Amino acid sequence: MPDTTGGHPAALKVVTLDGPAGVGKTTLARRVADALGIPYLDTGAMFRTMAWRLGPDGPDLDEALLRDRLAGFIFTLRGRGGASVLSCNGEDIGNEIRTEDVGAMASRIAALPVVRECLKAAQQRMGAAQPLVVEGRDMGTVVFPGARHKFFLDAAPEIRAMRRYTQLQTMGEAHDLALLTEQIRSRDEQDRNRAVAPLRPAADAIIVDTGDLDIDGVFGVIMQHIRSRDGL
């Protein structure tokens, strides 16, 4: 298993951004990666890709069969900054995984220990090979507990639902705001109460409430902490 406790030089440069859906993790992770000139890894896209490829019956597969299927997914990362591209089995991951249905399936498979075990190993391999900005739900607590910089982003469900509603509109998808709010509350409960790698901030994470700040404001807070600690 790769050393994620700080012994590997690259591990010192891992920046983790954790938090629930709708707090701006993706946008912020891309910007931070651009500012630092290092690759960006969207771990949520890895779960979504597995869910999309496994299909609706994926979470119900026999564990041995599921483990065999998971072994066939090879993730690679190329490029730097926000333009980093994640691929699965040689195919770039696109917007086909960004639907609400795929997100719901991803939340289900994310609760399975065998799935988290598989992706944790893949993510740690990437972090051991190079500095990274990673976003997810358990990056600072489980995958990269020795990361030099850890942030946990949060906001009220209503604020996050509105952000998601606006995002889906730009993608040409129509959704009911009240339903989105309820879905976010439900996913929060599922993510925070699951037995494996529940959503929670690391003990040494900087907690940022994104509800009262725009993207520029949150980005400024994150970069100030990074530069202060690194003496930049």
From Swiss-Prot:
UniProt keyword Manganese present: no
Reactions catalysed: CMP + ATP = CDP + ADP; dCMP + ATP = dCDP + ADP
GO biological process entries: nucleobase-containing small molecule interconversion; pyrimidine nucleotide metabolic process
Entry binding sites for ATP: G19, P20, A21, G22, V23, G24, K25, T26, T27
GO cellular component: cytosol
Keywords: ATP-binding, Cytoplasm, Kinase, Nucleotide-binding, Transferase
GO terms assigned for molecular function: ATP binding; CMP kinase activity; dCMP kinase activity
Primary location recorded for the protein, binned into one broad class: cytoplasm
UniProt-listed Enzyme Commission number(s): 2.7.4.25
Family designation: Belongs to the cytidylate kinase family. Type 1 subfamily.
Stored PANTHER family: CYTIDYLATE KINASE, CYTIDYLATE KINASE/PANTOATE-BETA-ALANINE LIGASE
Name of the molecule in the record: Cytidylate kinase
The species this protein was found in: Nitratidesulfovibrio vulgaris (strain DP4) (Desulfovibrio vulgaris)
